Structure formats: structure tokens, C-alpha cells
């Protein structure tokens, strides 16, 4: 009788477009990360594998001469036809970048999704400019569960911040969800590795519903 890709008689398994026997096509499928760029300073990160050279990553921008990008340790300037030049030559998935743009724009990056479990972010004592590697939103307490947090550790985005209040209270503040494409500043007292979980599409929603259904204290 007929056999599938697993060479079992009667099997109907077929290779998906990634050549995975019985796969669902998710292992090789490209994803696209659109990042809206505002006039002035923008904090962003990338969660996509591939050519990380600065001129490739930023190729979708309609950049203007003297537009500026910096990481925590280096920077580059846009020179027009010569492209982006400076000590910052490659963008990492683990870092946050600040981009100063003379015009509103859209940064669009495509490629294969990063696996957060194999992209640890080494946190140093003090301030760290961190990226966000998962493909979906993550509730802050789940997202930062891997680090050695201590009271008064602090995380901020351009629009909100949260403080760590200890094991029972966790992270609390206006910054309650971490989001793909966004970057953050994280201040920690103890160096450790930040390894984000692989969040599903609904993980942040489920967590919000759980919080809403908690009985109120009497």
C-alpha cells in the first residue's frame, strides 16, 4: 500500500514546506516584525534571525542623513548613499536600540523567529538595555521570572515602568506587559541570565483574565 514520509505502510503523513515529516509548516515559516518609528527617539528590539548587519536590518527605513542609532555601548550614523556607518555594525536580538529619526517611518524586518530559550540575555549589575525575543506579548512577571530579582530592581520603557517589590508582590507598575519590537532598560542589583519563555498568542490575555477573576479581599 501507499506509505507516507515516515515509510510506514498506510501512512498519510507528508512533508511540510520545511521538509519536516508530518510538520505543520511552522519550523521554517518567516515572520515579519513591523516597528512604527516616530519622529525623534525610538526604543526598539528585534526578535528575528538572519543577516543582522545594520544596513540590512535598517534597509526598510527611508532614513535621513544624520539619523542616529545607538546601543548601550556603540553607535552609528546614517550617511546617505554610504549607508549606516560607525562602531555599531550588527544588531543583536538580545539588546535594545535607540533610533533617532528625522521623520516618522516604518521599520519592517522579516526572517525566521528567534527561539527565546536559546537566546539568553546576560544581565550585568546596574542598567541593561534589553531586547524582547519572544514572538508574542508576555506578562511582566512571567517574562522576567528567570532573573535573580531583588527589591527595587527597576524596568522602564518610554511609556511606563515597573518596580520589583519582592517575591510575594513581584513586579508592579504601569509596565505590565512586554511586547515584540519594544526595548527596555532594566536595572538589577544582581547579575543573572534573562531567558524569556516561549509565549503563545493568548498568554498575556489569559493572565489578565485570571487577575480580573481573583476574589477581592474582604
List each language-model region with its residue ranges.
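N-terminal exported-region signature
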Residues: 30-218
Amino acid at each position: 500500500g501507499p506509505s507516507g514520509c515516515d515509510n510506514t505502510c498506510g501512512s498519510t503523513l507528508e512533508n511540510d514546506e520545511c521538509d519536516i515529516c508530518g510538520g505543520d509548516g511552522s519550523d521554517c515559516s518567516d515572520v515579519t516584525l513591523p516597528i512604527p518609528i516616530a519622529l525623534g527617539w525610538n526604543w526598539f528590539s528585534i526578535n528575528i534571525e538572519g543577516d543582522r548587519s545594520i544596513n540590512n536590518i535598517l534597509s526598510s527605513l527611508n532614513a535621513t542623513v544624520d539619523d542616529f542609532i545607538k546601543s548601550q555601548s556603540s553607535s552609528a550614523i546614517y550617511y546617505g548613499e554610504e549607508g549606516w556607518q560607525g562602531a555599531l555594525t550588527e544588531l543583536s536580538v538580545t539588546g535594545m536600540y535607540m533610533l533617532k529619526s528625522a521623520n516618522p517611518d516604518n521599520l519592517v524586518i522579516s526572517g525566521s523567529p528567534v527561539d527565546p530559550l536559546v537566546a539568553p540575555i546576560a544581565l550585568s549589575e546596574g542598567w541593561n538595555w534589553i531586547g524582547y525575543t519572544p514572538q508574542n506579548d508576555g506578562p511582566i512577571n512571567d517574562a522576567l521570572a528567570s532573573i535573580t530579582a531583588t527589591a527595587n530592581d527597576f524596568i522602564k520603557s518610554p511609556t511606563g515602568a515597573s518596580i520589583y517589590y519582592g517575591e510575594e508582590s513581584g513586579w508592579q507598575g504601569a509596565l505590565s506587559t512586554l511586547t515584540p519590537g519594544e526595548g527596555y532598560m532594566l536595572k538589577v542589583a544582581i547579575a543573572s541570565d534573562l531567558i524569556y519563555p516561549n509565549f503563545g498568542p493568548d498568554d498575556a490575555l489569559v493572565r489578565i483574565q485570571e487577575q480580573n477573576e481573583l476574589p477581592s479581599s474582604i
